Amino acid sequence: MDLWQLLLTLALAGSSDAFSGRETTAAVLSRVSQSLLSVNPGLKTNSSKEPKFTKCRSPELETFSCRWTDAVHHGLKSPGPIQLFYTRRNTQEGTQEWKECPDYVSAGENSCYFNSSFTSIWIPYCIKLTSNGGTVDEKCFSVDQIVQPDPPIALNWTLLNISLTGVHADIQVRWEAPPNADIQKGWMVLEYELQYKEVNETQWKMMDPILSTSVPLYSLRVDKEYEVRVRSRQRKSENYGEFSEVLYVKLPQMSQFTCEEDFYYPWLLIIIFGISGLTVMLFVFLFSKQQRIKMLILPPVPVPKIKGIDPDLLKEGKLEEVNTILAIHDSYKPEFHSDDSWVEFIELDIEDPDEKTEGLDTDRLLSSDHEKSRSNLGVKDGDSGRTSCYEPDMLETDFNANDIHDGTSEVVQPQRLKGEADLLCLDQKNQNNSPYHDACPAIHQPSVIQAEKNKPQPLLIDGAESTHQAAHIQLSNPSSLANIDFYAQVSDITPAGSVVLSPGQKNNGGMSQWDMHPEVVSLCQANFIMDNAYFCEADAKKCIPVTPHIKVESHTEPSFNQEDIYITTESLTTTARRPGTAEHVPGSEMPVPDYTSIHIVQSPQGLILNATALPLPDKEFLSSCGYVAQTN
């Protein structure tokens, strides 16, 4: 440096005679100095540079060393000696004593080495540099903070596998820990960082820190050469040590073809051509199936087609011509569905509870006060009646037939009953020649009733005036009370919709018990004519005559069980007839017809029943209450 300054001074002194004035000399000197600084930046105008600490490190956490820079002095005067002093910050010692560096040689030039005797791991240190009696630099630290391990040694690699294409390969890199680091005893725990790159590259690829001394490298090119290096640091520390020596990795070429370039699949071209092909196929399919797809997406509106009718007539709205064509052809007449079965329902009037007891069939048969009302023939539009399911034309036909039947029955029935009674009496008089013809007037009315019952034609209940007369005749003669049929309950409903009633009892000929006990007859008649539908058990027992002196083997006394307290009027009538029949031998047994089904519902208060040819066997009905029910 001094030589350059001397040459510069001589040059300036020699050129001072060529230039006049100080200003010119100063300008020349500044230009020369800038030229020299551009050539050699180390030539500065400052006279000196103070020494500084560069770093302090402990490679194995047992010893440490510190280094500093050399002092630079550009003046003519040489710098003084550089000394290092240290002290420990011990809290037990009251004063701090500065001591000079124990070894300036072991760690090299411009360094101080502290062996294990002067090293304390958990005690902080303070160091300073002095020159010519003054402090140049100062620093404080602890040994565990300056740990920087030595580089790992013995790096090598192992081939793991090569890809099927022979382009890439995987390797395993191994190394050993620094020899001076006590890893086996656990005095130090090191973390390793591996870096690798291709030979021609400048940027290193770093891997995550690991605790093991081996790491795999994947997908390395076979035709490339790689550089690998490793460094370490104390765990939980930020200061890495020096890098190890560089390991060069050259992978062998296993395949016969050269791997100068990567073999890439043309995925982009494959995708483009694939989409194009699918689009073309879709358009071809749509074009070939155009009509069918149109039918599926937009189905045509069906045109009304009738055989023998031009569809244009329907489109133009000429309905009169269409109706004319339909009227000509009988095949186009509307067909009624005959498969639908009509169900007949009995009208029930549940508005007034008192009317239920007044409209019983038995009371209508026995009562003469009930007169037919023409106003009852009106149709009641209810959900439970016939009007809810019958057609209006059918309804008018039924009512017209009922009106004609009611009108004729009022005039013809009395004459028919009287004529048949006369014929019956005359027949008995001619055959028997007995004095019974005197009693014909007495039995005239019951015979007429039996003859009328034996006819298979339907019986009109509460529909004509003759029925009321027959009921009045029966009430005038007590012996005819047993011939009355009591329809106790509905037993079944046929599939056709008819209602089947429970059967009645047979009428045994001969003298009845009513003739033997007239007071019982009058009492029972009074009880039966009662408007109430229920009568007491005690009254029912009064109707049964007591015959203690007559013993008949086939006779069985009726018993009223305490559990079955209800008895029916049929059982009561049968019980009242049996004492007489046991005492007298029956002369003839005439069956009383049982009207077991409803023929026509004439009006809300009238029923026409069907008569059966043969009587059904007797049935015993057990009831379970203390009142006798007189039902329809």
Curated annotation (Swiss-Prot):
Region (Disordered): 356-386
Biased composition (Basic and acidic residues): 356-384
UniProt KW keywords: Cell membrane, Disulfide bond, Endocytosis, Glycoprotein, Membrane, Phosphoprotein, Receptor, Secreted, Signal, Transmembrane, Transmembrane helix, Ubl conjugation
Gene Ontology MF term list: cytokine receptor activity
Region annotation Required for JAK2 binding: where it falls in the sequence: 294-379
Residue ranges of the motif WSXWS motif: 240-244
One GO BP annotation of this record: endocytosis
Domain Fibronectin type-III: 151-254
Residues recorded with modification Phosphotyrosine: Y487, Y595
Positions on the Cytoplasmic side per record topology: 289-632
Topological relation to the membrane, as annotated: Single-pass type I membrane protein
Gene3D superfamilies: Immunoglobulins
Motif (Box 1 motif): 297-305
Residues that carry a glycan: N46, N115, N156, N161, N200
Subunit composition and interactions: On growth hormone (GH) binding, forms homodimers and binds JAK2 via a box 1-containing domain.
Name of the protein in question: Growth hormone receptor
Organism: Saimiri boliviensis boliviensis (Bolivian squirrel monkey)
Gene that this sequence comes from: GHR
